[in-house]
């Protein structure tokens, strides 16, 4: 409901993914767009104004001055041009955003590649499901889900591992609950107890970091008892014999001491899943945000393949994506190793195809640097300028003190956002952008559903849509782009992205959403893929045996507990939007962490008291809550609060394949504050 160019309330529409349902953020988290902190004019840092977390977003003119768009764009592009001329294109890198549209993500990666000649462009997928995508690309041949979450309606058994859908995917959680009400078996696996366990047949609260030992033990039982689907394996997979031989060493009786789950429970779960007519596997960042995140995902893929649970109704692999457009931004090429549609940057033929469409010369065949690697390169002096659109690494990156030091050292930082975020505190120029409610463009959700977004209100002040700002910068960088609207960008995307076959702008305007792949102009899209093979050599998916790898940093006498980080129901990622949403911030206004009641008692801290959390990277102080869902040797910390930033604590160690940091495990010392 819109009145006087303001959103008054929000109702769910009958879309293919939600059928009228909304999560708490969608229903109550909309008024941030009208917050007085909104950026409305371009800002340029005043001469000598120090960089750091020292700017009041309500009064940015202490450190910045207002500028015209002409001056700001000239300076933004000019600074990038100067760095390229002095040091080469590698001196400038970019972070895009999963909060932007597909068209904006596409233009952003194109600007970095075409304008600076390299692939050092990334976004927050590196911090959430990069390891999942690495495993899926390696073994299935596609980085998207094989079945929509709605397909749980056709399943007998479903596994949800490393995810807390009640808080982080509330709409999907309603389908999971419906599934159990009609008799479906729900298996929850998580080091934290979650609200979904009330609906579960089995709750496996395993030891943090022990995913591979637990999953391999389950698969060992399936092999040992002959419960695997031999016909499916022979027809659609490869490397089965190696997988089978590898699993021989993972008997549940050996693994129970490692993962903390009794052997009989592991055997029961194996029998339930293997015995299902159709089984689905859902996972979240509890699986992916480890140095062994790719191995965790390889295990889940292997479990689905050996039981024949891909490519049929009620079966499949579904990494629950964490942002409204992290799927779409990844599809659009906003990642350093792939061009749009996951086409590798290392192929001369593929780059040649894009060069032809773009009307430009070739660029580097090297895979680019990822989010954390880019900031490391800033520290080393190799990258001297950045263009950051809708991303907040000063809050979201691991070992965030290191990230902030990198941002402060940049010679030229352009930040494009809707608020003066923590990252914008380090900017030389700030460009005011339109929020999602204020722009046109498509987004692609976790279900592979491409959806049309339309503006409900106009942007405040002089704020502009992100795609239009990027096009203006490209012009000043000499790229000669000609786009009159997001529809023009979408038309270009279709020239190189087969996933968009049979999906047109006009069709999306008429139908609102189409799932890819769509096999004809009238096909609403395929909810299930790979029924007749996989987009790999000879149409076969691959088994990739995974070994047990310890977390990078394990508890010891100095740091005897484990800290894990994540989201809350009320707050979204770094909090820049939801902490400015009236209802959501009123419900959850204060930085907090969760510990087991016995742990608090041992610390001499009452629930609601303050604790100090310290790792090898830094310390924070925050309010402590009692939560029996948290293991006695664990503390859970949400990462939305700048006053007690969880990522001061986190470990920047990376998964070697997905290059994702280990947000879910670090050794910590907890004391009364």
Kindly label every feature range from the protein language model.
Residues 93-101, 258-261, 284-291, 323, ...:
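Conserved short loop/turn motifs at secondary-structure junctions
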Residues 327-335, 486-583:
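Long, low-complexity segments enriched in small/aliphatic residues
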């Amino acid at each position: 409901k819109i009145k006087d160019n303001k959103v008054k309330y929000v109702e769910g529409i009958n879309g293919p993914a939600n059928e009228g349902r909304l999560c708490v953020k969608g229903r109550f988290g909309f008024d941030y767009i009208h917050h007085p902190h909104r950026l409305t004019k371009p800002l340029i840092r005043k001469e000598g104004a120090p960089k750091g977390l020292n700017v009041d977003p309500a009064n940015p003119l202490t450190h910045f001055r207002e500028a015209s768009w002409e001056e700001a764009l000239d300076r933004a592009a000019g600074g990038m041009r100067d760095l390229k001329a002095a040091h080469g294109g590698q001196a400038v890198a970019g972070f895009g955003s999963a909060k932007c549209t597909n068209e904006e993500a596409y233009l952003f990666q194109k600007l970095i590649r075409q304008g600076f000649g390299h692939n050092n462009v990334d976004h927050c997928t590196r911090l959430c499901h990069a390891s999942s995508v690495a495993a899926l690309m390696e073994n299935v041949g596609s980085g998207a889900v094989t079945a929509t979450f709605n397909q749980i309606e056709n399943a007998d058994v479903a596994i949800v591992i490393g995810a807390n859908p009640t808080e982080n995917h509330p709409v999907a959680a309603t389908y999971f609950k419906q599934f159990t009400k009609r008799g479906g078996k729900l298996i929850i696996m998580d080091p934290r107890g979650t609200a979904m366990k009330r609906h579960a047949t089995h709750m496996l609260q395993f030891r943090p970091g022990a995913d591979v030992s637990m999953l391999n033990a389950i698969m060992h039982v399936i092999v040992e008892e002959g419960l695997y689907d031999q016909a499916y394996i022979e027809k659609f997979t490869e490397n089965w014999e190696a997988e089978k031989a590898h699993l021989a060493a993972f008997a549940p009786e050996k693994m129970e001491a490692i993962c903390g789950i009794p052997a009989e429970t592991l055997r029961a779960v194996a029998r339930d899943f293997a015995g299902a007519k159709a089984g689905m596997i859902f996972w979240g960042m509890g699986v992916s945000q480890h140095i062994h995140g790719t191995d965790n995902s390889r295990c889940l893929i292997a479990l689905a393949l050996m039981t024949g649970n891909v490519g049929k109704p009620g079966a499949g692999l579904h990494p629950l994506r964490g942002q409204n457009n992290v799927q779409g931004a990844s599809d659009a090429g906003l990642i350093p190793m792939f061009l749009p549609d996951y086409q590798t940057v290392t192929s001369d033929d593929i780059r040649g195809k894009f060069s032809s469409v773009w009307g430009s010369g070739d660029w580097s065949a090297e895979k680019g640097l990822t989010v954390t690697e880019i900031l490391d390169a800033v520290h080393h002096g190799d990258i001297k300028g950045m263009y950051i659109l809708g991303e907040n690494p000063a809050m979201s990156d691991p070992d965030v003190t290191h990230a902030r030091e990198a941002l402060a050292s940049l010679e030229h930082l352009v930040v494009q956002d809707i608020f003066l975020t923590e990252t914008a505190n380090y900017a030389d120029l700030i460009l005011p952008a339109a929020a999602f409610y204020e722009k046109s463009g498509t987004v692609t959700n976790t279900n592979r559903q491409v959806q049309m977004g339309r503006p409900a209100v106009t942007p405040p002040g002089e704020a502009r849509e992100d795609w239009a700002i990027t096009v203006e910068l490209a012009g000043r960088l000499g790229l000669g782009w000609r786009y009159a609207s997001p529809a023009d960008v979408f038309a270009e995307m279709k020239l190189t992205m087969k996933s968009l076959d049979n999906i047109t702008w006009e069709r999306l305007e008429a139908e609102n959403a189409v799932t890819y792949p769509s096999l004809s102009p009238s096909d609403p899209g395929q909810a299930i893929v790979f029924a007749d093979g996989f987009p790999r050599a000879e149409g076969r998916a691959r088994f990739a045996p995974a070994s047990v790898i310890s977390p990078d940093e394990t508890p010891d006498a100095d740091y005897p507990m484990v800290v894990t980080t994540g989201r809350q129901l009320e707050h979204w990622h770094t909090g820049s939007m939801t902490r400015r949403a009236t209802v959501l911030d009123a419900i959850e206004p204060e930085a907090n962490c969760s510990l087991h009641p016995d742990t608090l008692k041992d610390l001499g801290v009452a629930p609601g008291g303050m604790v100090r959390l310290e790792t090898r990277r830094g310390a924070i102080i925050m309010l402590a809550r009692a939560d029996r869902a948290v293991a006695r040797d664990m503390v859970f910390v949400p990462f939305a609060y700048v006053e007690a930033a969880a990522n001061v604590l986190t470990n920047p160690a990376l998964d070697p394949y997905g290059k994702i940091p280990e947000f879910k495990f670090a050794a910590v010392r907890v004391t009364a504050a």
